[in-house]
Amino acid sequence: MSKQIVHGDQCRKKIIEGINVVANAVGITLGPKGRCVAIEQSYGPPKITKDGVSVAKAIQLKDKSLNVGAQFVISVASKTADVAGDGTTTATVIADAAVRELNKAEVAGIDIQEVRKGAEKAVEAVIADVRKNSSPVKNEEEIAQVATVSSNGDREIGEKIANAMKQVGQEGVITVEDSKNFNFEVEVVKGMRFDRGYISQYFATNREKMITEFENPYILLLDQKVSTVQPLVPVLEAVAHTGKPLVLIADDVDGEALTALILNNLKGSIKVVAVKAPGFGDRKKEMLEDIAILTNGEVITEQLGIKLEKVNDTSKLGTANRVIVTKDHTTIVHDKNNSDIEKKVNSRCEQIREAIKDTTSDYEKEKLQERLAKLRNGVAVLKVGGATEVEQKERKDRVEDALHATRAAVEEGIVPGGGVALFYASRVLDSLKFDNEDQRVGINIIKKVLEAPVRQIVKNAGGKEDVVVNELSKSNDKNRGFDARTMQYVDMIKAGIVDPTKVVRTALQDAFSVASLVIATSAMITDHEEDNNTGNRSGGGVGGGHHGGMGGMDF
């Protein structure tokens, strides 16, 4: 395929234009009076959302050069979402403003490398000030406030998330799923989460969120590594006959075995996900046993004389109501009404409590307490309903955003919301030292850019940006801000308008990181437009060996 190359000013102009297209679409969602965006789906009704990263990821521009710019800002939103779980719109708005201001400096002939150094110093100083003024989340009401703000002012969402955290603890497991009725409910069920995700992204059933979700799966627990597929064939055939999915938790899965599982998963011969077992050494064996008790299954281990190739039915496999696997975590949700499992779990918890009493190692005691918490506290499930499928999905998006924001707040604390944390933090730049005048330009650019979130929130509310910015500039109270819902100046903390420190910090860091890359770019290479319309390419699949087995499956 032939390529086209764009250099210099024309290159940067196209990139900035592409960034601006995405930023305009994402920016309108910011704040309590931000608007929703309708995203066309490949089938069914459109997706209605205020989630910045969902809006950004949905954008694919026809002009290849503009699309390069769009991808820059999409990467900002995605990275911020991955790290903080929220703040993607703020990051996008800041990145757009930073790129435009940095480009003005370069066009004016100022040494852009020195400008970047000054801007980098400014970002570090602002983040330090934000952290210094952060307050820890102290109670259920503050948790509810964070969740309410992040869910676009939906107090019910805030209260439900706070209630869920109260029941399972601030570090407990909380999942979000569709309700079968109109209501929004919190239910605590038996289950656990451990810090291991899928071995390959090809197992993801939801490509947009890159997660695997299985309803009523079988769970195969292996205390061994699997490299060849042949020992797995009997149990895979047994599960395939039931039509249910399979969660395989093992020391590791690689080589031929991994290839065959991916191939059959993609073909739909059997729904399967492979996950590495949590822990190491003896602790791994104990955690596998914990999972076995919770799922009413057995750990397949040759130490007990059980060989994998001899497992040819589902009798030794565990079960669960639901399993959710991401790249980092696996969550198992079980029926809380199963009395047999309840008894086994209680007995197992008592064993762990005795082990805690007997150990003299602080480290060992900590790990035992973690295991006890996983078994005892269960999983809080937020069941989100709605009058229509579109309404339900939109609300579910807001619940997930609010949950991410709440976790970030618990982790690093909270600061005044509405964009004022960054706005007031910019005052530290007035006394920041610089090596030359070009660096001072960079510092002043960041000072101006930090007004962008406040301006966007006011703009979306139909207010006058300059008037609000001017009014806040006169204030000596760092908690004073503009409540876009009431169009009044208030004490943001007292009004319950707060942002997680981690979200604010990450948004600024990621935005500046991408803005720096953009301004350092002087050429781009894209496909020629006419080449994109010539014929269809057949995508390569995942190869796999054929070693016999049931029809329709590749082993």
Swiss-Prot record:
Keywords: ATP-binding, Chaperone, Cytoplasm, Isomerase, Nucleotide-binding. Its EC number is 5.6.1.7. It is an enzyme of class 5 (isomerase). Forms a cylinder of 14 subunits composed of two heptameric rings stacked back-to-back. Interacts with the co-chaperonin GroES. It catalyses: ATP + H2O + a folded polypeptide = ADP + phosphate + an unfolded polypeptide. This is Chaperonin GroEL. One of its GO terms (biological process) is protein refolding. It comes from the Bacteria. SUPFAM superfamilies: GroEL apical domain-like (SSF52029), GroEL equatorial domain-like (SSF48592), GroEL-intermediate domain like (SSF54849). CDD domains: GroEL. Pfam families: Cpn60_TCP1. Residues 528-555 are annotated as: Disordered. One of its GO terms (cellular component) is cytoplasm. ATP binds at residues 29-32, 50, 86-90, 418, 499. Residues 537-555 have a biased composition (Gly residues). GO terms for molecular function: ATP binding; ATP-dependent protein folding chaperone; isomerase activity; unfolded protein binding. The gene is groEL. It comes from Orientia tsutsugamushi (strain Ikeda) (Rickettsia tsutsugamushi). It is found in: Cytoplasm. Together with its co-chaperonin GroES, plays an essential role in assisting protein folding. The GroEL-GroES system forms a nano-cage that allows encapsulation of the non-native substrate proteins and provides a physical environment optimized to promote and accelerate protein folding.
